[in-house]
UniProtKB/Swiss-Prot annotation:
Auto-ubiquitinated. Effects of auto-monoubiquitination at Lys-91 and Lys-180 are unclear. Gene3D superfamilies: Ubiquitin Conjugating Enzyme. This is Ubiquitin-conjugating enzyme E2 T. There is a cross-link at residue 189 (Glycyl lysine isopeptide (Lys-Gly) (interchain with G-Cter in SUMO2)). It comes from Bos taurus. The gene is UBE2T. The lineage of its organism: Eukaryota, Metazoa, Chordata, Craniata, Vertebrata. PROSITE patterns: UBC_1 (PS00183), UBC_2 (PS50127). Residues 146-157 have a biased composition (Basic and acidic residues). Its main location: nucleus.
Amino acid sequence: MQRTSRLKRELSLLAAEPPPGITCWQDGDRMEDLRAQILGGANTPYEKGVFKLEVHIPERYPFEPPQIRFLTPIYHPNIDSAGRICLDVLKLPPKGAWRPSLNIATLLTSIQQLMAEPNPDDPLMADISSEFKYNKPVFFKNARQWTEKHARQKTDEEGMPGSLPEVGGSEGPSAAQKRKAGQLSSGGKRFCPDV
């Protein structure tokens, strides 16, 4: 019951006063299944990209964090090829920082901030993390190419936005990206736990 009343309030607030570059809405009839969209920030390799996310609200919300994953493929050290996100506020303590006082808007804003400022010391994608740390020009080039390929609004003949590719679709992650997801590098790097 608490989940339903809180979700209604949060969705109403998100509709009335959405954070800049973020939208969130109910997906179908089930209130616990939401969709969100984050616009890539200016001066980032994700600029002009439109990134769709899936948000599932657990039964014990707000005492458990929502489960959020990217549907749009993204080249990022903290987001894997399945769209899973390594971010402390998406996990319960002691390993995470979720608190019942946080809300969906806060989480989406935190994800938007992570897009702008990756954390290469807590990666899901070891190779991309190394690239970000030691060869930023290559990282930015690759991230821009992925954004162009997967997250740019396509228009039809009449100039109307078309649909965006989703993970697992015909334009999903490349075989190389899937391989990177399975590779762990040595050297004492810490990898995102419990994702």
